[in-house]
Amino acid sequence: MPSNSVLHLALFVPWESFLSNMQGDITKIWSGYENTLSNRLRFYVSNISLLRKSAEDARRDAKLWASRSEGDDTIDMDIPLDEGDYGQEPATMAEHHQYYTALLQTLQNAVHDSDATRGSPVLQGLIQDLHQENPVEEGRSFVQRHDDFYQQIRCDQNGSLYGFPSLSGDDIQAVVKAQGMLHLRMLDEIESGLPNNTYGTGNGNTEDMLTGFNDAEIPFPRQGQNLVTAQTQVPRIFVDVGPETAFVELGRLAASKKTLNNLQNMALQLVCRFLDKYTADPESAGQHFQYTGGQAGTGKSRVVDALKDVFIERGQPHLLQITGTSGSAAAQIGGTTVHSACGLDTRRSSNQPLSFSEGKKWMWKQKLVLIIDEVSMLGGATLYEISRHLQSLRDCPDKPFGGIPVVLLMGDFYQFAPVLETSLLVNKLLESSLSSVGQAAISHHRGYSLWQMFKTVVILEEQIRARGDPELRDLLDRVRNGVQTHQDLQLLNTKVIDRSQITFRNGLRAITPLNRNRWSLNMEAVVDWARFNKRHISIFISAHTWRNGTLSLEEIARTIDQGDDSSCKVPGVLFYAQGMPVVVNTNIYTGLKIVNGAEFTAVDIIPDPKHPGYHLADDVTIHFGPPLGILTQSRETEGLNVPGLPTGTILICPASHTLDPRHPHFKFLSTKCSRRGLPVVPAFALTDYKAQGKTFAEVLLELRGNHMSDSQPSKCDFTSLNIQLSRCTTLQGIKLLSPVRSIDFIDNKLDKRMLDAMERLQDLAAETKRRYEG
């Protein structure tokens, strides 16, 4: 834009260098000078380029962002642009003392009342340090850290942002906008299967790609329009030239490359055989519905990877659609959520007509294979909605799933079931009379009927995760079959570890279904890990804005003490140390795999000047408000190049959540409260749900239920028992936080309906194997 070029010339180039130049285009003049700027000036230029988006553009981006919501794991953050003070007055020193007292109360509760951290020497040591440096009873003012404190910390700890210009609020806005646009571009690439060669995670053109993103629609060829004359700003159509290799042959090569075992190879070849049949004669081939299951650690994702290689070798990755029922499941296999891919909208009535863009419909009509992973979380009603949407997307209302040639469901029904729906394995109509059936039951039954069409079944059996430990492998088999013994119980109880021996210094992870125990364990773990590794500890109290009324110290303390859970993604207090593992609590950037349950390393923090740090101990600083953001990285972000950030990192910013007295967890509140903080927490301790799909060398387990009854944990859920025990690679690596009760282990198995359904799947798997081998 010419006005931008004038502005850039005026700001970054000596005027005498260009005022005499009366010829040529102003943009070309600026481009010539831009290439000569220093890296520091180019950093500011890129931020200004990103910030030039108008408010109207931002609203358009927000609408597009909303259209990418992920079903049950919806993006529950607004576009995180830090545009003001959120209506908060600066906190007084008296309020600081209230929150500090509340923090101490939380720590003392963990030491005295929590089964998980009772008597923790690590937390007792921290409490002692805080009392020594800042006695509550004296009420003296906190000593504020100097302005360059975190720069010094970065220097001492080799922080990722050391040497980078300090990021202002405007810089944060630019980074967030860049990440949001990159997320949408990546999501388009994942959903379409077409690699966009105009940018790459490690390429220097990322800034140009981001600056121009969303400035125009990408037209798709309409019915009757010649593909050659279709005008597109970005090339989105690939033409395959040369002979195609058969799917079966490429499947053999992929299986050899991935070293698939016999059952994995069968799962792959069943799909490849059908695809060869379909490409030879689409009209007579029909459709192929396949379920590939198996317990955790049997290598289901390797089948997906091999099938992905087959399509890549054919030059047709865009014909394969990979999805998961949750953001984390999708991210683990390189896909997107099925809600996003199929345009599922939890707010749309089933009676409303479906409407999709011609571009999205055109994309879906090309697809040969749809993969849906983590099928245990897929309810019957959602499966029916997927089929209904695909019928509309593919303009094929008379065939299941819109006539897509292959639908491949993956997952383990011994893992967690749908939260708000009923498992595909359950026929609800058997449990109620037809006269009393509601719309939800009807939708589920339609999905259940679709599920009954999946008669090609492969159950993977070879335990890859625990194959080096036959004793653990046999134990897991007995647990899945519900025949675990008292001898197994005695064996597990030899794994109980004394409280004084629990340390998180060397990579130990904990899994507990009880949120309160998780909060306490994570506080202990951060302090233990940070002090052992000589890392500074920063404590961020989330900002709380009360609607009205005078609050007691007890009410403030209970609010701070209530951490994150499934209904509140923001913790009351965040303990941070550079290099610690963190887990994300909500879907933020699905295209960049920043999703609910995804794990990252926290490599730096950007404090908010409005919430300065105060000295609590030589290695402990407290902030009475959230930071501007936390900088994270993982293997998934390697090579990612966001303007303004170190290569390979992504910034996560604060989110807001309303605490409502009507919610069971916040009944103690006298009025509503808005909490603002980071939607991430330390990942030393995880819930059983977020541990699903992860593997650890050493793990501390709590085989209990997920709520308290009469001051005792409820019975351990079978799914939790199965998932926790199968997270480790060896029996030696398993440690127990507390003894396993008989009620938690003996006769703990799936209910009869599920067992009967699993028996049917085993029969279908045997029949499938006979057909395949015959």
Where are these predicted regions, by residue range?
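RecA-like helicase/translocase P-loop NTPase motor core
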Residues: 229-774
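Intrinsic low-complexity, intrinsically disordered terminal tails and linker regions enriched
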Residues: 1-254, 290, 748, 758-765, ...
